Amino acid sequence: MNDFFSVEPNYYLVLAAVLFTIGAAGVLVRRNAIVLFMCVELMLNAANLTLVTFSRINGDLNGQIIAFFVMVVAAAEVVVGLAIIMAIFRTRRSASVDDANLLKY
């Protein structure tokens, strides 16, 4: 076949599960907004890996197309999120998500 299936698809799915678990643990444990964004991106990449793996197993392109759109939306999310984090950092001198709650007062 090709190089993608030189490794069994199960290994890609296990890797995606491990990446998603690391990202979810980071979102639950960390309080720094930049680290939270990196963990969310890790979770999105794990979902993309799962979509691409199932797409290649089934032989269609639907999963790859959805993964591409997820990457586009994630890029837009990062742009908006980093702008908000920079605004919070300029006013509070901290990137903690606890300080974001203080913006409403």
UniProtKB/Swiss-Prot annotation:
InterPro entries: NADH_UbQ_OxRdtase_chain4L/K, NUOK/Mnh_C1-like. It is found in: Cell membrane. It is a multi-pass membrane protein. The keyword Zinc-finger does not apply. Gene3D superfamilies: 1.10.287.3510. It is an enzyme of class 7 (translocase). GO terms for molecular function: NADH:ubiquinone reductase (non-electrogenic) activity; quinone binding. The chain crosses the membrane at residues 9-29, 34-54, 65-85. One of its GO terms (cellular component) is plasma membrane. Keywords: Cell membrane, Membrane, NAD, Quinone, Translocase, Transmembrane, Transmembrane helix, Transport. Disulfide bonds: none annotated. Its EC number is 7.1.1.-. The keyword Signal does not apply. GO terms for biological process: ATP synthesis coupled electron transport. It catalyses: a quinone + NADH + 5 H(+)(in) = a quinol + NAD(+) + 4 H(+)(out). NDH-1 shuttles electrons from NADH, via FMN and iron-sulfur (Fe-S) centers, to quinones in the respiratory chain. The immediate electron acceptor for the enzyme in this species is believed to be a menaquinone. Couples the redox reaction to proton translocation (for every two electrons transferred, four hydrogen ions are translocated across the cytoplasmic membrane), and thus conserves the redox energy in a proton gradient. NDH-1 is composed of 14 different subunits. Subunits NuoA, H, J, K, L, M, N constitute the membrane sector of the complex. Belongs to the complex I subunit 4L family. This is NADH-quinone oxidoreductase subunit K. The gene is nuoK.
